């Protein structure tokens, strides 16, 4: 079942934790690619100095952050790596959750091809398929074309995992500082990164 619009409403930190264990789905050329979310980071503009929307900055890139929750915010870093975020909080409150890592589930062959241009890969390469925000976007075929897309769409959405299949019983959720935000002054220390401790696809222990 797709996560309903109400899933994305409310406190961004709580939404971030709720996203863990759910499945991010992208349909590419009719083929489902997906992964279980195992690591996220929350960004709470306009007060969070790590957020693109800090200080209420509105640009063509960040405009989607000010819109309705439950939409995709995709941007480029270093001019080449895409990052996928879920917009949260009410309209006008620019907050979101970065999906940092997935455990691949559906479309594994397509994911391998997207990452390595081959399907015969090593165990080490398999562990690197989706253990980072840029890697997972490449694996699932998420690009700037998906910026602003509603997560109620048929082709891009969060699929709720049934309780009996949810991996939360196997892993403890750990909170810690976010990664690669050296510019963010005191916000460097906010414990707004949430991940499944010990999961092999987490990007950084």
Swiss-Prot record:
Q: What's the domain of life for this entry?
A: Bacteria
One Pfam family this sequence matches? Pur_DNA_glyco
State the family named in the UniProt similarity comment for this chain: Belongs to the DNA glycosylase MPG family.
UniProt keyword list: DNA damage, DNA repair, Hydrolase
Q: Which GO terms describe its biological process?
A: base-excision repair
HAMAP family, per database record:
3MGH
Q: What is its EC number?
A: 3.2.2.-
Output the Gene Ontology terms for molecular function.
alkylbase DNA N-glycosylase activity; DNA binding
The protein's matches in InterPro entries, at most eight in alphabetical order, are given as: Formyl_transferase-like_C_sf, MPG, MPG_sf
Protein name according to UniProt: Putative 3-methyladenine DNA glycosylase
Question: PANTHER family recorded for this chain?
Answer: DNA-3-METHYLADENINE GLYCOSYLASE
Question: Which CDD domains does this one have?
Answer: AAG
């Amino acid at each position: 079942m797709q996560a309903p619009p109400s899933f994305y409403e409310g406190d961004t930190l709580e939404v971030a934790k709720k996203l863990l264990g759910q499945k991010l789905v992208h349909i590419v050329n009719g083929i489902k690619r997906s992964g279980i979310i195992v690591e996220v980071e929350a960004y709470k503009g306009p007060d969070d100095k790590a957020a693109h929307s800090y200080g209420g900055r509105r640009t063509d890139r960040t405009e989607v952050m000010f819109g309705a929750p439950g939409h995709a915010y995709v941007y480029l870093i270093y001019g080449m790596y895409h990052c996928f975020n879920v917009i949260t909080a009410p309209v006008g409150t620019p907050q979101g959750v970065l999906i940092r890592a997935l455990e691949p589930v559906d479309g594994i062959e397509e994911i391998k091809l997207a990452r390595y241009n081959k399907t015969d890969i090593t165990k080490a390469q398999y562990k690197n398929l989706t253990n980072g925000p840029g890697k997972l976007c490449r694996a699932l075929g998420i690009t700037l074309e998906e910026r602003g897309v509603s997560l109620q769409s048929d082709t891009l959405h969060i699929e709720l995992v049934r309780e009996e299949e949810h991996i939360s019983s196997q892993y403890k959720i750990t909170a810690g500082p976010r990664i690669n935000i050296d510019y963010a002054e005191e916000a460097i220390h906010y414990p707004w990164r949430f991940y499944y401790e010990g999961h092999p696809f987490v990007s950084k222990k």
